[in-house]
Amino acid sequence: MAHPILRFNVAIIGGGVIGCSVAHFIKSMAPETEVGVIEPDPTYEFASTLRASGGCRVQFSRSENIEMSKFSIDFIKNFQSRMSIPGKEPAEVDWVEGGYLFIVEPESVELLERNVALQNSMGCDVRLLTPQQLKTNFPSMNVTDLGAGAHSPKDGWCDPNGLLWGFRKKAASEGVAFVNAQVVSMDCAPTAVRALNLDGGQVVVAEEFVNAAGAW
């Protein structure tokens, strides 16, 4: 008996937080797009997402990373309203605005100053602190061998499990199909993937493929 062929406009390999968020954003921008997510473990016992710390910070040295972090922090702070589903319990990500603190030795102060200047120029609340200011703000810290610190009080962390399930439930409500299977091989042309072969014998055909598979 021939195995079924599953057809999508976009097929996403991996249903962790990246795969589910990609699926949601595709559907939010193009609701008519047929999206399928292939995930072998619906319990997420070994998923990369659940091994994450959930930290979100703007303290990066490249503008692209800073912009992505600014978007992410704003998105997570408003996650409940963005992921709301009529008649369903709101998504909980337990956002904690605990701030981030980076410290450097004296020879790295100039680099930290450049990074903070870039972050400030992009509208981020990041404060450069001298060793004396570090001691005042964090009395338990030994600052004798420090050159400076950078504190971003509006950074924080969230619950990765809540983030994952918020995206997954929202994507499912938008019509994303979740396929409980493992990708075992791909049929490839010289410059593109044509189809995915699953462990149950099914074949996934799509116009576009996204690799969101994690390390586990």
Question: What is the role of each PLM region?
Answer:
Residues 27-49:
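Glycine-rich FAD pyrophosphate-binding loop
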Residues 15, 60, 105, 213-214:
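Glycine-rich, N-terminal phosphate-binding loop of Rossmann-like dinucleotide-binding domains
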Residues 3-18, 36:
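Beta1/beta-strand and adjacent pyrophosphate-binding region of the FAD-binding site
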